[in-house]
Amino acid sequence: MTRRIYLKMKSLQEAVEIFLGHWDLSTMLSMEKIATTEAAGRVTAAPVFARFSVPTYHSAAMDGIALEAKRTFGAAPEKPIRLKLGVDAFWVNTGQCLPPGTNSVIMVEQLHQLDPDTVEIQAAAFPWQYVRKVGEDIVATELLLPQNHLITPAEVGAMLGAGVLEVAVKQIPRVLVIPTGDELVDVQHLEGVKAPPAGKVVEFNSWVLVHLLRQWGAICHRHEIVPDEPEQLRQAILHAVQGDYHIVVVNAGSSAGSEDHTANLIAELGEVLVHGVAIMPGKPTVLGEVNSVPVVGNPGYPVSAVISLEQFVRP
């Protein structure tokens, strides 16, 4: 069998634009609603707005007494003002709702309690002193998160605090990695610590790719090793694109070698968008689609495989 050459090599920028521009990435993943408590690490499918303000009431920011500020005007060390508890002022703890008719808090450290019913102050308080007003943190209807936003743990708290109990998120991408090659030995078939025979190598690339994809937030599965047999690889690709995978990565089989079938199969089953990218390592990358599903022919050399994955699958 003759070897092919790369006739239409693309620059990295061209390849990225062609491949990513071939699909409407905003609609590739369907929307689903999930409990906000489970939303960390997910991507919003729509803007998220606060259902109510935080806090929802005027609350004390300090332990002390709540009162109407104007009752304290004129207070000074030489002219203290006495206040009747339960009449002029009311004990409050941090976070407690202000009693009706009050708009200020004086810290307990600034009070002189004369008896169980009377306190004395020597300085005036201003309106809303040591008070967390309604909406200080979040205002009802405020935009909390934009669309296409990766939700952090802190933002889960903000949404829950603002009454958002469900959130619309994008479906988690599902990726299948298919390792290929007659020379590959599955780790499950190794005999203890005995090295594989000459001409055979332990297949590990796919596990590196699988765990990278999971680290990036995808649900990723690994196909069993497919030998250098076009019909078996054809069936593996067809089964994947007809299932529920959003991306298929074929590892190895993308170069111009006589046993590298990936590009031919993608062209036969769908369309090759790019074959060959002007990067080293990573040159043999094949980018295409089958049944409207992105299929990436990932180089077999380990460093090339990772670089290709980072450039074309991670986005």
Language model region names:
Residues 2-167:
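Phosphate-interaction motifs
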Residues 93, 122, 146, 177-180, ...:
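Short beta-strand segments
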Residues 96, 181-183, 254, 302:
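Glycine-rich beta-alpha junction loops
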Residues 100-101, 153-154, 186-187, 255-260, ...:
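Short glycine/serine/threonine-rich phosphate/pyrophosphate-binding segments
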Residues 133-250:
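Phosphate-binding glycine-rich loops and their immediate beta-loop-alpha structural context
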Residues 208, 216-315:
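Short glycine/threonine-rich loop/turn motifs
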